[in-house]
Amino acid sequence: MDFLLLGLCLHWLLRRPSGVVLCLLGACFQMLPAAPSGCPGQCRCEGRLLYCEALNLTEAPHNLSGLLGLSLRYNSLSELRAGQFTGLMQLTWLYLDHNHICSVQGDAFQKLRRVKELTLSSNQITELANTTFRPMPNLRSVDLSYNKLQALAPDLFHGLRKLTTLHMRANAIQFVPVRIFQDCRSLKFLDIGYNQLKSLARNSFAGLFKLTELHLEHNDLIKVNFAHFPRLISLHSLCLRRNKVAIVVSSLDWVWNLEKMDLSGNEIEYMEPHVFETVPYLQTLQLDSNRLTYIEPRILNSWKSLTSITLAGNLWDCGRNVCALASWLSNFQGRYDANLQCASPEYAQGEDVLDAVYAFHLCEDGAEPTSGHLLSVAVTNRSDLTPPESSATTLVDGGEGHDGTFEPITVALPGGEHAENAVQIHKVVTGTMALIFSFLIVVLVLYVSWKCFPASLRQLRQCFVTQRRKQKQKQTMHQMAAMSAQEYYVDYKPNHIEGALVIINEYGSCTCHQQPARECEV
């Protein structure tokens, strides 16, 4: 074919000048990449995109050229051999996820220089050589999640200056090598969650100047030091949820632009007072489900930019140390979870923190100050119960006395009696509403029974009528018995004249006197 085209060009050049143009066009056509030779059986072709998915393939199709995209997901590939994709020099994306790949040779992706997206997730890969991604310097996205990687080669991502997204979730990675991401200057999203990381090196994330989102959740980290994230000037979201973190510290004094931090579900008992001063732009903070008992006033003062915070599920000690937190919450204008319960002391267990502060007068005058600060009168129960004229609890710094010692300043704020009256009214209203609600429930049950079971109600009514008749009969019998038991006395008035009664017999007369008598009728 090439010789024929060359002969035609020479012929046209000899006969007319326009042959030069035709020869140039022919040369251009020869330089264009060849179209795919044919669509393999059972695969789906869309132009220069080939989809061979869920076909139980054990090897990649052969004799493929000119493809821009190849999907071999949901098959039974077990290994990637060296030079397996050498004929796909125009390929821009390659999907190999959901196979059984356990071995990837170092030269498996040879000559795939134009590939920008590579997916190897949901396989059984245990290790990757340093040279695995070297033939693909234009990679933008790599997905290695849901494999069995235990370690990362120190130079695994060397040369990937255009990489923007890297997924390594759900592996068995125990350590992140120092400066492993040094060349990943464009990386914006990094996910190493659901692994087995126990610690972080100070320079593990060095070079990630454009990183905006970092996921380290569900690992085994026991300590968080903000010094482990140096120069991450573009980081906006840091997720450390569900680790085993007990303390949070910061050994470097520098400021970064973090806006969202998730530390929930850990075992945090202590946070350095200055730890949040390095994140002055923090807007969302999640500290729920930890072991915090109180929060230092200095930490609370550094939360000036927060708009949302979660603190539930901690072991709050509702003693004097809780006053600073209660005061801050009463003045906080953002969103926070209302389910903050006291874990100690015993008399306040299960009570809401703000309710306990008010009910037990924890922050009134006369108590000793904590941490060089004194909180004045009781913190109001809720913003909806606080009267307009009452003031919230105020945190006041101490001053120096005449002898140079620190003396607390107490400030008495009005509104205690009004708040107490409001609480009493609230209790009365709540009880009344509960009674009304109970009565309505009873009426509703009777109405539903009357509508759904009329025969049963008729029998029940007849039973009540019969019982009432029996009770009336019993009462009548008792009354008649009582009347018959009474004695009625009738005075007897004889017809003859009371006086002497003369009886005459053969011996003579006998005189006797007759006394009046009474007859008793029964």
UniProtKB/Swiss-Prot annotation:
<keyword id="KW-0433">Leucine-rich repeat</keyword>
<dbReference type="GO" id="GO:0031623">
    <property type="term" value="P:receptor internalization"/>
</dbReference>
<dbReference type="GO" id="GO:0098982">
    <property type="term" value="C:GABA-ergic synapse"/>
</dbReference>
<dbReference type="InterPro" id="IPR003591">
    <property type="entry name" value="Leu-rich_rpt_typical-subtyp"/>
</dbReference>
<feature type="domain" description="LRRCT">
    <location>
        <begin position="314"/>
        <end position="365"/>
    </location>
</feature>
<dbReference type="GO" id="GO:0007626">
    <property type="term" value="P:locomotory behavior"/>
</dbReference>
<protein>
    <recommendedName>
        <fullName>Leucine-rich repeat transmembrane neuronal protein 1</fullName>
    </recommendedName>
</protein>
<dbReference type="GO" id="GO:0005783">
    <property type="term" value="C:endoplasmic reticulum"/>
</dbReference>
<feature type="domain" description="LRRNT">
    <location>
        <begin position="35"/>
        <end position="63"/>
    </location>
</feature>
<dbReference type="GO" id="GO:0050808">
    <property type="term" value="P:synapse organization"/>
</dbReference>
<dbReference type="Pfam" id="PF13855">
    <property type="entry name" value="LRR_8"/>
</dbReference>
<feature type="repeat" description="LRR 2">
    <location>
        <begin position="89"/>
        <end position="111"/>
    </location>
</feature>
<feature type="glycosylation site" description="N-linked (GlcNAc...) asparagine">
    <location>
        <position position="56"/>
    </location>
</feature>
<keyword id="KW-0732">Signal</keyword>
<dbReference type="GO" id="GO:0099634">
    <property type="term" value="C:postsynaptic specialization membrane"/>
</dbReference>
<feature type="repeat" description="LRR 1">
    <location>
        <begin position="64"/>
        <end position="87"/>
    </location>
</feature>
<feature type="glycosylation site" description="N-linked (GlcNAc...) asparagine">
    <location>
        <position position="130"/>
    </location>
</feature>
<keyword id="KW-0812">Transmembrane</keyword>
<dbReference type="GO" id="GO:0060291">
    <property type="term" value="P:long-term synaptic potentiation"/>
</dbReference>
<keyword id="KW-0325">Glycoprotein</keyword>
<dbReference type="GO" id="GO:0035640">
    <property type="term" value="P:exploration behavior"/>
</dbReference>
<dbReference type="GO" id="GO:0060076">
    <property type="term" value="C:excitatory synapse"/>
</dbReference>
<feature type="repeat" description="LRR 4">
    <location>
        <begin position="136"/>
        <end position="159"/>
    </location>
</feature>
<feature type="repeat" description="LRR 7">
    <location>
        <begin position="209"/>
        <end position="231"/>
    </location>
</feature>
<dbReference type="GO" id="GO:0051965">
    <property type="term" value="P:positive regulation of synapse assembly"/>
</dbReference>
<dbReference type="GO" id="GO:0035418">
    <property type="term" value="P:protein localization to synapse"/>
</dbReference>
<feature type="repeat" description="LRR 9">
    <location>
        <begin position="256"/>
        <end position="278"/>
    </location>
</feature>
<feature type="repeat" description="LRR 10">
    <location>
        <begin position="280"/>
        <end position="302"/>
    </location>
</feature>
<feature type="repeat" description="LRR 6">
    <location>
        <begin position="184"/>
        <end position="207"/>
    </location>
</feature>
<dbReference type="InterPro" id="IPR032675">
    <property type="entry name" value="LRR_dom_sf"/>
</dbReference>
<dbReference type="InterPro" id="IPR001611">
    <property type="entry name" value="Leu-rich_rpt"/>
</dbReference>
<feature type="topological domain" description="Extracellular">
    <location>
        <begin position="35"/>
        <end position="427"/>
    </location>
</feature>
<feature type="transmembrane region" description="Helical">
    <location>
        <begin position="428"/>
        <end position="448"/>
    </location>
</feature>
<keyword id="KW-0472">Membrane</keyword>
<feature type="repeat" description="LRR 8">
    <location>
        <begin position="233"/>
        <end position="255"/>
    </location>
</feature>
<feature type="glycosylation site" description="N-linked (GlcNAc...) asparagine">
    <location>
        <position position="63"/>
    </location>
</feature>
<comment type="similarity">
    <text>Belongs to the LRRTM family.</text>
</comment>
<feature type="repeat" description="LRR 3">
    <location>
        <begin position="112"/>
        <end position="135"/>
    </location>
</feature>
<dbReference type="GO" id="GO:0016020">
    <property type="term" value="C:membrane"/>
</dbReference>
<dbReference type="GO" id="GO:0002091">
    <property type="term" value="P:negative regulation of receptor internalization"/>
</dbReference>
<comment type="function">
    <text>Exhibits strong synaptogenic activity, restricted to excitatory presynaptic differentiation, acting at both pre- and postsynaptic level.</text>
</comment>
<feature type="repeat" description="LRR 5">
    <location>
        <begin position="161"/>
        <end position="183"/>
    </location>
</feature>
